[in-house]
């Protein structure tokens, strides 16, 4: 089966992206399917803003060509809810569904998923996209509730992408040896941004410090 999958560059030297990592993981672990990567999204060193318009026009033409060359391919469209994506991706998705293509939209969070205030024009775009008769994939039940209740999405499937934290409930203070030479090591791997859980990480570290757990944060 041919599957067209969108994401930024899969080369980590050109782009540090959670979507790229997820896409590479999907392709690498699903060898029975023929994935066709369509690169969409700027590289880390590319200029943004108005400088992107000529490149986007070129990409839109390439998108039409890609769909024409693979008429039977289904589409796995990765969709972060950021301002650049909200202004770009609906055009690409609209072309695909107007052509009657089978498509699943994989939502990857983003600033405007949980933002208390969304500019009116972006909110209208989001409600328009999620109002389409398309299947949407999200990464948690909380995100599913947000899409259905706030944006009116009807066909949403949750595929959690985090580790099972049930064992954390069994963690008890007396089981931890307060050995300053062997503090608890906390690792963070990802982009340093407010919407990547920085506030939650800070609160967790403050709580550990207050309860006198020795720890070391590695970023």
Where are these regions (language model features)?
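A short, basic/aromatic alpha-helical/loop segment that forms part
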Residues: 13, 83, 168, 193-198
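Nucleotide-sugar-dependent glycosyltransferase donor-binding/catalytic pocket residues
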Residues: 11-15, 164, 191-194, 207-213
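Donor nucleotide-sugar binding/catalytic pocket of nucleotide-sugar-dependent glycosyltransferases
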Residues: 126-171
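A short, histidine- and acid-enriched strand-loop-helix "catalytic/donor-clamping" loop
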Residues: 80-84, 101-120, 135
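Membrane-proximal helix-turn-helix segments that form the acceptor-binding/catalytic region
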Residues: 92-99, 119-135
């Amino acid at each position: 089966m041919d599957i067209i999958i969108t994401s930024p560059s899969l080369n980590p030297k050109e782009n540090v992206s959670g979507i790229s990592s997820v896409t590479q993981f999907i392709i690498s672990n699903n060898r029975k399917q023929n994935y066709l990567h369509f690169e969409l999204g700027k590289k880390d060193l590319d200029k943004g803003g108005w400088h992107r318009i000529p490149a986007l026009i070129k990409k839109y033409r390439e998108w039409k060509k890609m769909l024409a060359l693979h008429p039977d391919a289904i589409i796995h469209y990765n969709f972060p809810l950021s301002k650049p994506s909200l202004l770009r991706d609906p055009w690409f998705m609209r072309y695909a569904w107007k052509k009657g293509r089978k498509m699943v939209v994989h939502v990857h969070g983003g600033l405007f998923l949980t933002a208390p205030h969304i500019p009116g024009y972006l909110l209208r775009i989001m409600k328009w996209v999620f109002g389409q008769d398309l299947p949407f994939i999200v990464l948690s039940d909380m995100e599913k509730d947000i899409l259905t209740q706030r944006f009116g999405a009807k066909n949403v499937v949750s595929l959690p992408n985090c580790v099972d934290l049930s064992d954390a409930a069994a963690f008890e203070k007396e089981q931890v040896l307060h050995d300053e030479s062997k503090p608890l090591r906390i690792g963070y791997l990802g982009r340093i941004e407010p919407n990547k859980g920085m506030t939650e990480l800070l609160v967790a570290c403050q709580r550990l410090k207050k309860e006198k757990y020795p720890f070391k944060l590695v970023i």
